[in-house]
């Protein structure tokens, strides 16, 4: 039985894209760029990682910016923290493909090459408030839970 982890989405085959932790005490798994991406000055782009994540019903995957991105790549994760819900995995809209929403904070073009580490992903548990009666079902992919 699978508990939590990462898989490639069907349109990618390079297993080097599968996230891993770099050190024994690291909380985050490094997600990589799956498609060469050019980010124009000031532009916000969705950077494909080529992976999806599965987890338990009371877990979430948080995406955090790498601390070196602003300094070394002049990029920031524009939504500060990405939230990947468990029901995003395998959705009919995009299989659960995880994207990093990055902004170029310079007046220069930034090029992201395949295999570059772009964000960190951290699994965590979450709590439900008393009286919560959420019973909706995800019907789409990226950004689809809003009304």
Report the location of each language-model feature.
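DUTPase catalytic domain/fold
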Residues: 1-147
